[in-house]
Amino acid sequence: MISDTQIFVALILALFSFVLAIRLGTSLY
């Protein structure tokens, strides 16, 4: 069973990778 802390960490990692991808994408253009 997935705990709340694992969901919280997964959301933070997803948000971090999303922002990082946007910064890399905007820096390329």
Curated annotation (Swiss-Prot):
Q: Cite the InterPro entries for this sequence.
A: PSI_PsaM, PSI_PsaM_sf
Family to which the UniProt record says this protein belongs: Belongs to the PsaM family.
Give the protein's recorded name. Photosystem I reaction center subunit XII
UniProt keywords (A-Z) are: Chloroplast, Membrane, Photosynthesis, Photosystem I, Plastid, Thylakoid, Transmembrane, Transmembrane helix
Please give the start and end residues of each transmembrane region. Answer: 7-26
Cited Pfam families = PsaM
Task: Identify its membrane topology class.
Answer: Single-pass membrane protein
Q: Does the keyword Transmembrane helix apply?
A: yes
Intracellular or extracellular location(s): Plastid, Chloroplast thylakoid membrane
What are its GO cellular component terms? chloroplast thylakoid membrane; photosystem I
Q: Name one GO biological process term.
A: photosynthesis
